[in-house]
A protein has these predicted regions:
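Structured loop/turn residues at secondary-structure junctions
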Residues: 46, 75, 99-100, 222, ...
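Residue-level "edge-of-site" marker
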Residues: 14, 100, 311-312
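Conserved helicase C-terminal RecA-like lobe
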Residues: 66, 80-89, 105, 112-323
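Helicase P-loop NTPase motor core
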Residues: 1-93, 118-120
């Protein structure tokens, strides 16, 4: 292929110059490994139910396959956030390729700092994370500001924060959320509205993509009635074992990162417009063709079993619900 590409005539003509050489009927070729022996397309009403269905299917597949022989593929890294949470809750270990886990993403840590401080005003790491979003605030300044806040003296707080009015505004915003409790999803929505200008400033090159990832967090919160339980579950880490070489984990991967790899069982999620194919691909024919090629790559990663998940509706924060 490297020599002749896809030109069959060149290959055939060149073959006669290499003796001894035979030409065999392609139909006589019998591959050693069979193609996918089972596959299914599963439609679910909403994409937030998809994670539960996928976890259930993975638990079934683990009866027949080792964890490292199972993979879940998706178009973009943030598409797996809900699944990561569900896998953590189920105690299913996983490793991820292509994009950070939601617990590692900087913008997610930024947003969750507000929520953690809302639940616990004395959460020093959360306060430090929120303060770090502002220019000119180092560790020593954080310590002084935190001490003033912890003492609860309004005059001392005003004085300590005089040089940092934007951070003081953040603190007042958190206080306002604490004074008027809302559902977890509504709370996260409010935090995102407050944080968005800073998101655009801190991450000017890719803030729209990060915004989409944060909207996934809001959708995850919609399944909870208690904010503290949501935060506790979000903080769960995938179980790890000492000396783990990855064989004891299911693989989560973007399609791009999966090129050249194969698994016995493959599950492809979020097969719906605006996810896979992506939003931008729908506007240009050439981009849509690239999505078709990616879909081919994704499907051909499966050796034995292929499951396709098609949500009937996607959560849209802009629409305040599903669309």
């Amino acid at each position: 292929y490297k020599l002749f590409g896809v030109n069959a005539e060149l290959l055939i003509d060149h073959a006669w110059g290499w003796e001894p050489c035979t030409i065999a009927d392609v139909k006589a070729y019998k591959p050693e490994n069979k193609s996918v022996v089972s596959g299914q397309v599963l439609q679910n009403p909403y994409n937030f139910e998809q994670a539960r269905l996928v976890v259930r299917r993975i638990e079934e597949l683990l009866q027949e396959h080792l964890p490292h022989e199972i993979a879940v593929l998706f178009r973009a890294g943030f598409h797996s956030y809900q699944l990561e949470l569900a896998l953590n809750q189920a105690g299913v270990a996983f490793r991820k390729y292509g994009g950070l886990r939601y617990t590692e993403a900087a913008h997610v840590k930024d947003v969750m700092a507000y929520v953690r401080l809302l639940l616990n005003p004395l959460d020093l790491p959360a306060f430090a994370r929120m303060a770090a979003q502002h220019h000119g605030i180092g560790p020593k300044t954080v310590e002084k500001l935190y001490t003033a806040t912890a003492r609860g003296d309004a005059k001392n707080v005003e004085k300590a924060f005089a040089r940092f009015p934007a951070l003081l505004e953040d603190m007042r915003f958190v206080d306002s959320l604490r004074a008027a409790p809302q559902t977890p999803a509504a709370t996260l929505n409010a935090v995102l509205e407050h944080y968005r200008p800073r998101l655009e400033t801190l991450y000017p090159e890719d803030w729209p993509r990060r915004q989409q990832g944060l909207e996934e967090i809001v959708q995850m919160a919609s399944a909870y009635t208690e904010l503290d339980l949501f935060v506790a579950d979000l903080a769960l880490e995938s179980p790890e074992e000492e000396g783990d070489d990855g064989e004891g984990r299911v693989t989560l991967s973007t399609v791009h990162s999966a090129k050249g790899l194969e698994w016995n069982a493959v599950l492809i999620i979020d097969l719906v417009e605006d996810r896979f194919p992506s939003r931008h691909a729908l506007a240009r024919p050439e981009d849509f063709e690239e999505e078709r090629r990616l879909m081919y790559v994704a499907c051909t990663r499966a050796r034995q079993s292929l499951d396709l998940y098609v949500p009937a509706a996607l959560y849209s924060r802009a629409e305040r619900g599903n669309q």
